[in-house]
């Protein structure tokens, strides 16, 4: 069955993964809050990314840079001049669109659009192809104008151009401007990488497709610094690592993932090569994870703007270079959405029954194990077992407790939210010290002594 966006959105809202932000005030467009389950799942994703790409690598460091940076950072990086979208308005109903996206939806292979495409060319296509407004079907468009995507605000009490600052549209620049600090304080030698997870903000003209494109989001970015002659080998290494992570760590079906090499004439101004790893979302194939060779564009640009030399000094060979950079870049909300789409299933059972199942790998499950008393009179004893297990809980191992409703309905709820196992505390538990463990995907059950429960947890709930 083909998964519809409305279906997955309703599921996530109903179970408390995602809420409409400011809902009691009728919400705020394109703004979402992550409920208790969504917050846990997002944290699991981030921990898994750090474990795989940072903490298990001998040449990686972690950074947490400021959201608000000196505006000259954005002047040097090109964001003030180039980080914009072509905005066009419908003259009839005043609806606003990205002109390039309207044209892309024509699916006309003869039309090539890049970030450097002249606005007059886009205007002519809108006229020649009689592109209609999605809301009122008018073909009467305004002139295209460039709309900068950075959120602008002011620092201090005076709102003038001297106090203008911006919320960062990416985390990468915080890494580049700290290159010298990291080399000096951490005594780094090329090649090495720096990773960062943090908030970024983009004032998108047409956000949408649920959490796929939002104005506030989290990024996981790595800037890997290296000599030019090592670029190809490391670029290929990251291709393999990203695919391995998606398929073998997140257990995403490889049929839902494909590579897309960006054509030379479509590359961003800073990139000499970019591969997008695309996922088949409900709205179609779209970018999930980007991998770019940025050359030495950023370090050179910041050297020129700041007057500080951001080079690397090889003390053994007595040489200086401005290293090249390879950048894997991922939106946390985007990979979260892909995980939901990949692992959500509606399973048909006997007697015309069905169940919703979120078949998450155990490392991603919001709760690895739920403790459920069979009947209410066993609630106190089951809750004490739950409290005992909480003593061994940590960032990667979480337990939950639920005593409300029939055991069957509780099983269904935990299947739906992705809990890998349910532990049932029944009369055998009380009289013989034996509990029943039910596995989510197969629904098979085993019985184990409570005395062996911690060993079972070590064997089955840690990856």
UniProtKB/Swiss-Prot annotation:
GO biological process: glycyl-tRNA aminoacylation
Superkingdom, taxonomy of origin: Bacteria
Assigned keywords, A-Z: Aminoacyl-tRNA synthetase, ATP-binding, Cytoplasm, Ligase, Nucleotide-binding, Protein biosynthesis
GO CC terms, sorted: cytoplasm
Enzyme class: ligase
UniProt-listed Pfam families: HGTP_anticodon, tRNA-synt_2b
SUPFAM superfamilies associated with the record: Class II aaRS ABD-related, Class II aaRS and biotin synthetases
Reactions performed catalytically: tRNA(Gly) + glycine + ATP = glycyl-tRNA(Gly) + AMP + diphosphate
Residue ranges crossing the lipid bilayer per the database entry: none
Cited InterPro entries: aa-tRNA-synt_IIb (IPR002314), aa-tRNA-synth_II (IPR006195), aa-tRNA-synth_II/BPL/LPL (IPR045864), Anticodon-bd (IPR004154), Anticodon-bd_dom_sf (IPR036621), Gly-tRNA_synthase/POLG2 (IPR027031), Gly_tRNA_ligase_bac (IPR022961), GlyRS-like_core (IPR033731)
Assembly: Homodimer.
Role this protein plays: Catalyzes the attachment of glycine to tRNA(Gly).
Name of this protein: Glycine--tRNA ligase
Species for this entry: Mycoplasmoides gallisepticum (strain R(low / passage 15 / clone 2)) (Mycoplasma gallisepticum)
Lineage, uppermost ranks: Bacteria, Bacillati, Mycoplasmatota, Mycoplasmoidales, Mycoplasmoidaceae
Gene: glyQS
């Amino acid at each position: 069955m083909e998964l519809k966006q409305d279906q997955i959105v309703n599921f996530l809202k109903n179970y408390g993964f995602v809420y409409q932000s400011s809902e009691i005030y009728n919400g705020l467009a394109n703004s979402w809050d992550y409920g208790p389950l969504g917050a846990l799942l997002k944290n699991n994703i981030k921990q898994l990314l750090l474990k795989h790409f940072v903490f298990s690598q001998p040449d990686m460091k972690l950074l947490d840079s400021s959201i608000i940076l000196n505006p000259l950072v954005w002047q040097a990086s090109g964001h003030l001049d180039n980080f914009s979208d072509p905005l066009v308005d419908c003259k009839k109903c005043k609806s606003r669109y990205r002109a390039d996206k309207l044209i892309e939806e024509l699916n006309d292979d003869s039309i090539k659009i890049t970030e450097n495409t002249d606005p007059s060319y886009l205007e002519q296509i809108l006229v020649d192809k009689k592109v209609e407004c999605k809301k009122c079907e008018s073909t009467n468009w305004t002139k295209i104008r460039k709309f900068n995507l950075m959120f602008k605000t002011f620092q201090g009490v005076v709102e003038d151009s001297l106090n203008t600052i911006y919320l960062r549209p990416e985390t990468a620049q915080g890494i580049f401007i700290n290159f010298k600090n990291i080399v000096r304080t951490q005594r780094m030698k090329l090649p090495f990488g720096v990773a960062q997870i943090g908030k970024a903000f983009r004032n998108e003209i047409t956000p949408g497709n649920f959490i796929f494109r939002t104005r506030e989001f989290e990024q996981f970015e790595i800037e890997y610094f290296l000599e030019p002659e090592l670029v190809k080998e490391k670029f290929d290494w990251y291709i393999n690592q990203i695919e391995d992570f998606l398929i073998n760590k997140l257990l995403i079906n490889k049929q839902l993932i494909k590579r897309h090499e960006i054509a030379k004439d479509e590359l961003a101004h800073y990139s000499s090569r970019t591969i997008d790893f695309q996922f088949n979302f409900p709205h179609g194939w779209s970018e999930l994870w980007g991998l770019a060779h940025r050359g030495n564009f950023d370090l050179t640009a910041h050297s020129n703007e700041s007057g500080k030399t951001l080079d690397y000094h090889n003390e053994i060979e007595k040489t200086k270079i401005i290293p090249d950079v390879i950048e894997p870049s991922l939106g946390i909300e985007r990979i979260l959405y892909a995980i939901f789409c990949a692992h959500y299933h509606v399973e048909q059972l006997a007697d015309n029954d069905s169940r919703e199942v979120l078949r998450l790998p155990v490392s991603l499950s919001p709760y690895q194990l739920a403790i459920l008393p069979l009947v209410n009179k066993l609630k106190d004893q089951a809750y004490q077992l739950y409290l005992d297990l909480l003593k061994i809980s940590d960032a990667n191992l979480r337990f939950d407790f639920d005593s409300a409703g029939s055991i069957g309905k509780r099983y269904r709820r935990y299947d739906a939210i992705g809990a890998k196992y349910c532990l049932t505390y029944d009369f055998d538990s009380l009289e013989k010290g034996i509990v029943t463990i039910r596995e989510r995907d197969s629904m098979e059950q085993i019985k184990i002594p409570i005395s062996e429960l911690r060993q079972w947890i070590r064997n089955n709930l840690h990856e």
